[in-house]
Amino acid sequence: AKLAQALGAASTAPALQAAQRPERPRGKLNAPKVCKAVGHLLPENAILIDEAITSGLMLNVMTQGAPRHDLITLTGGAIGQGLPNAVGAAVACPDRPVIALIGDGTAMYTIQALWTMAREGLNVTAIIFNNASYSVLNVELERVGAEEAGPKAKSQLDLHGPVLHFAQLAQGMGVHAVRTDEAEGFCKALEYALAHP
């Protein structure tokens, strides 16, 4: 209140955003549409785990009008905590749905958490974005002034060879999994996952 008075803003009403869910996405699937679908379908009291890195940039915008939920995010400087965070959240709060948004590179650090989810029957829906790259590390190379990485460095940040098939990896660990390239298929799969913990 004192700061608002000092700035001459004491009588200014705060700008409040309407609590409105985004529309159901349609068409070819991309990262913002995944975040939009999560915002559209997010159940009340859910726990969101965000380690989608560059793929999850729109998550906060798309879920701000969703029902009340908790968000656990990456603190920076390391990757690989998202799937284990989802396990921990599901164990700590078995009555709440957990939705984990995970990048493909970070998933590879702790992919075995999927097996734990299946073994323990945890209420976790894991969404793995597959852009076949450690995209955030390419950004970090630029931030530290490595203007043009050489072919060896670039190859270390590429996840194309061999191609990762996350749905097959998950199925091999006992997790029901699907892969989709269409927003409609993604929404249908997310609805199914939330209805069948």
Question: What are these language model-derived features?
Answer:
Residues 2-7, 19-24, 140-141, 157:
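Generic hydrophobic, helix-prone segments enriched in Leu/Val/Ile
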